[in-house]
Design a protein with these regions (language model features):
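Polyanionic, low-complexity segments and short acidic motifs
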Residues: 1-153
Length: 153
């Protein structure tokens, strides 16, 4: 996701760039002057970001921000999953018929090795792995934007 949105006039000339953090919970800004139309024109021609597990700083530090601080979308999603008792990634992997996990190496067929290594430092064992974290780290299947477990779940 891009960290900013271009606003374009009727000639498709960029007249402003709006940081994503300035648009959270401020729908009234779209009603001022010609902003809504400018935003739509900008979005229709702004390049789409590749689907990956990298988040813009606007989403990891400034989500729903005031002038001093904001929230982190990744932390918020992990906590939401825990609050709703979403099972861990390895449970869903097993439910999809992809085997069970007892060691970190069992994940390397679905998640790139470097990311598995990083996960092994953040989590005590594979059974603790949050579904949200693992699903955004899964290797994307050809022709899709999803990994194996989330696509089979």
């Amino acid at each position: 996701m891009s960290g900013s949105f271009q606003l374009k006039d009727e000639n498709h000339t960029v007249v402003a760039t709006a940081p994503l953090k300035d648009l959270f919970h401020l729908p009234h800004t779209l009603l001022v002057d010609n902003t809504y139309d400018q935003l739509l024109r900008g979005q229709s021609s702004q390049s789409v970001q590749d689907f990956n597990n990298v988040y813009t700083e606007q989403m990891t530090e400034w989500l729903f921000a005031n002038k001093d601080f904001g929230l982190d979308i990744v932390s918020l999603n992990v906590q939401r999953g825990r609050d709703h008792q979403i099972q861990g990634y390895t449970t869903y992997k097993y439910m999809c018929g992809l085997g069970s996990n007892y060691v970190w190496e069992d994940l390397k067929d679905l998640i790139p090795e470097e990311l598995v290594h990083r996960l092994s430092h953040a989590y005590q064992n594979p059974g603790d792995l949050d579904m949200y974290i693992a699903q955004v780290m899964e290797t994307v299947l050809p022709g899709t934007q999803l990994g194996t477990v989330i696509q089979n779940h």
